[in-house]
Amino acid sequence: MASPLRSLMLLLAVLAVAWAGTSRPPPRLLGAPQEADASEEGVQRALDFAVSEYNKGSNDAYHSRAIQVVRARKQLVAGINYYLDVEMGRTTCTKSQTNLTNCPFHDQPHLMRKALCSFQIYSVPWKGTHTLTKSSCKNA
């Protein structure tokens, strides 16, 4: 009788250890950056602002626009910090043109230019303000 009880206790101990070792997602820390959907309205506004600032700061004759958002994160602070990793591409639209929405990317090798950029945008939605707090790009 003691042997089956001992076996049952051993089995329960093994199961308890196995259950304790299973991976669980770590608890989310309040105020820590979290992943965001690139199609989210706030992310899109932050992206548009960052691209606009990128083009203002560029001495290129052509506008650039986002090819894709590689990663988007957001952090709730006294507003919202958006952290965006973006692949940028040079378009055929010159700086004198204002509408970038339909600007195709250059396809001629000597005019093509791509960059990987990291933008940090501080947004206060209830005030309607955006600030580009950090920006770094490297040729892709």
UniProtKB/Swiss-Prot annotation:
Major site of localization recorded for this protein: secreted
InterPro entries xrefs: Cystatin_dom, Cystatin_sf, Prot_inh_cystat_CS
Residue numbers marked as site, Reactive site: G31
Residues carrying covalently attached carbohydrate according to the record: N99
GO biological process: cellular response to hydrogen peroxide; cellular response to oxidative stress; defense response; embryo implantation; eye development; male gonad development; negative regulation of blood vessel remodeling; negative regulation of collagen catabolic process
Cellular component, GO annotation: axon; basement membrane; cell projection; contractile muscle fiber; cytoplasm; extracellular region; extracellular space; Golgi apparatus
Keyword Membrane applies: no
Family annotation (Pfam families): Cystatin
Keyword Signal found: yes
SS bonds (residue pairs): C93-C103, C117-C137
SUPFAM superfamilies for this protein: Cystatin/monellin
Motif Secondary area of contact, residue range(s) on this chain: 75-79
Annotated signal peptide: 1-20
Highest taxon of the lineage: Eukaryota
Family recorded in the similarity comment: Belongs to the cystatin family.
Protein name: Cystatin-C
Gene it is expressed from: Cst3
